[in-house]
């Protein structure tokens, strides 16, 4: 279920403040954040934000296509190792 239109999009205030300061000064630093639920705003385009995945911070470069999505959508929290191949033992059980 999506967020109510009357409430508006959520973004961590500190994150938005730091992005606006960087835009004003013309800086391009990697910002660390734990706020996976923050919505990507147009001011963030061109910046790299390191989003926490539960173990480490994964850098995400923000492009125009990402605006309106959440930061957490672009960082996976689980490692998929694939399904086990059919072994001789499992095929013999049938």
Curated annotation (Swiss-Prot):
The keyword NADP does not apply. GO terms for biological process: ribosomal small subunit assembly; translation. The keyword rRNA-binding applies. One of its GO terms (molecular function) is structural constituent of ribosome. Transmembrane segments: none annotated. It comes from the Bacteria. Disulfide bonds: none annotated. Pfam families: Ribosomal_S19 (PF00203). Protein S19 forms a complex with S13 that binds strongly to the 16S ribosomal RNA. This is Small ribosomal subunit protein uS19. It comes from Clostridium botulinum (strain Langeland / NCTC 10281 / Type F). The gene is rpsS.
């Amino acid at each position: 279920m999506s967020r109510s239109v009357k409430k508006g999009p959520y973004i961590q205030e500190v994150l938005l403040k730091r992005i606006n300061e960087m835009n004003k000064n013309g800086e391009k630093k990697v910002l660390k954040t734990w706020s996976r639920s923050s919505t990507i705003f147009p001011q963030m385009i061109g910046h790299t934000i390191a989003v926490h995945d539960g173990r480490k911070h994964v850098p995400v470069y923000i492009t125009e296509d990402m605006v309106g999505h959440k930061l957490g959508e672009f960082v996976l929290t689980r490692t998929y190792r694939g399904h086990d191949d059919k072994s001789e033992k499992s095929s013999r059980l049938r």
